[in-house]
Amino acid sequence: MIVSEVNFDGLIGPTHNYAGLSRGNVASALHAGQPSYPRQAALQGLEKMKHLMDMGLTQGVFLPPLRPVTHLLHHLGYKGDDKTILKQAAKDDRLLFNNLCSASSMWAANAATVISEFDSHDGRVHFITANLATMLHRHLEAQTTYAQLNQIFSNSCFFAMHHPLPCGQHFSDEGAANHMRITSAHGRTGINIFVYGEKNDIYPARQKLRASQAVARLGEVKPDLAWFIPQKKEAIAKGAFHNDVVAVANEYVLLAHAEAFEDQGEWIKRIAEKIDGFIPIIIDNITLEQAVKSYLFNSQIVTLKDRTMALILPQEVKSDPAVWETVNRIISGNNPIKKAVVVDVRESMANGGGPACLRLRVPLSKAALEAVDQRFILTPKRWEKLYQLVENFWPEKITPDDLVLPELWKTAVRAHWALTSWLG
């Protein structure tokens, strides 16, 4: 059975902006109020996808939902057509309105937690849609994300789809950004590491233990394969609002900051006892602040056809000499990571999302991949058409003040229908 990992990247939507909605996200706060460049943002994301395609990897795409959201306003008692209620909401409650316009669905790592068929009791790939309950602008994505996942992975012989957990911070779940799978190979049984946050006095911990436990139950993870590890409080306090800001794993390799987890040494020892050939790469020569600013650990590690691995990094790693030296030490070290690919995702980075944030990892057998809706799998031809579509329909530049302009809403609708046509 041939099993590979397919990355599904979120296409960045036409209302991409810097409204500073995400408490605990250092980059979001730093760039709040600045102009954004939605067209450039989406093209940067597409170029990253093309890099992986050119490396011989299968690449999928998630399409952005229509923004601004209007259904919530109807639930809140607004009356009239979409244009009328959006105008009124923008006048009444600007913060609420800004939440309705967010393009944060681009960060597909928060779409769901994915459980491999080799780790689930029923032998299917399980998708547990994240409720994203901590932040309103993220929570508004949950139901449309579930619908899109259900469309792409509709074959119940191979896939099991789960609704988001009940809303409320008791069950706050932010998806694969707080989940790592460590295994000797994608096609073998592995440990599912669920990283959760404990109470923090500075920033909210977005992943609750009881949520992670529920996700493991829903995904039918075999009990001995579900491990629950607390994220280090200092990491959250320094701006690591998801585990994937301080750690990333691929097959039997773990790349992590030395202060990523509580009792880290003990957990590393336990993983080594469970997984043959486990290689931990623990970085202790840069600070948590450097890790958060550079997003070194928000990289993608991918397995290439020759069984070596590549590190897909944001270009910001080159801005800090100590971080860039660390990258070079990694790829020259005694581990399978032999290639560093630097990509430009500056527009996403300015809102707190690096290469790893932009993708959802889905391990698929050859048969399961064939059962996926192929319209969401990119080929060179479909990628080119999507690239041209973005160039034609995405606005070049917007500011947070532009979000209230009806012309921008019309632009977003036109882009949405163009994507619908592209999908076919």
UniProtKB/Swiss-Prot annotation:
Keywords on record: Arginine metabolism, Hydrolase
InterPro entries: AstB_sf (IPR037031), SuccinylArg_d-Hdrlase_AstB (IPR007079)
Active site: residue positions: 174, 242, 357 (nucleophile)
A Pfam family this chain is assigned to: AstB
Pathway(s) the chain acts in: Amino-acid degradation; L-arginine degradation via AST pathway; L-glutamate and succinate from L-arginine: step 2/5
BP-aspect Gene Ontology terms: arginine catabolic process to glutamate; arginine catabolic process to succinate
Gene3D superfamilies linked: Succinylarginine dihydrolase
Highest taxon listed in the record's lineage: Bacteria
Catalytic activity: N(2)-succinyl-L-arginine + 2 H2O + 2 H(+) = N(2)-succinyl-L-ornithine + 2 NH4(+) + CO2
Enzyme class: hydrolase
EC number in record: 3.5.3.23
GO molecular function, one term: N-succinylarginine dihydrolase activity
Keyword Metal-binding tagged: no
Keyword Hydrolase carried by entry: yes
Family the UniProt entry places it in: Belongs to the succinylarginine dihydrolase family.
Function description: Catalyzes the hydrolysis of N(2)-succinylarginine into N(2)-succinylornithine, ammonia and CO(2).
Name of the molecule in the record: N-succinylarginine dihydrolase
Species: Zymomonas mobilis subsp. mobilis (strain ATCC 31821 / ZM4 / CP4)
Gene this chain is encoded by: astB
